[in-house]
């Protein structure tokens, strides 16, 4: 039924989330990649935005692969773009619920050793 040990095709093994999205873009650039509410993003636009986020994380924020960061945000298309863009840049993100108390936010960011 829902066997969690389904073997993936070789082309999917060892592929990052950003790599999988990029591969889908090459196959179907105009296909809807993500929908949140009434907003959508096709694969071409999603890859473009993920690339821009990755570049900003490295260039503007000064983070490097291996660094840690945090994002405090609700679910949105932009949230997904930041999480995947950070992953593509090699930055591990702690995803933090914006409804938490400020002290909890600080504790989570401290535990995650988030630079930003």
Label each residue range with its predicted role:
Residues 87:
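Anion (oxyanion) recognition and catalysis
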Residues 96-98:
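Short beta->alpha connector loops at strand-helix junctions that form conserved
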Residues 1-11:
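Short, charged, surface-exposed hinge/linker loops at domain edges
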Residues 10-32:
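A short N-terminal helical cap/helix-turn-helix that marks the beginning
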Residues 13, 30-84, 101-106, 110:
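Conserved AMP-binding/adenylate-forming core of the ANL superfamily
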Residues 90:
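Structured binding elements
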Residues 111-115:
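Active-site charged/polar residues at nucleotide-handling catalytic sites that mediate phosphoryl
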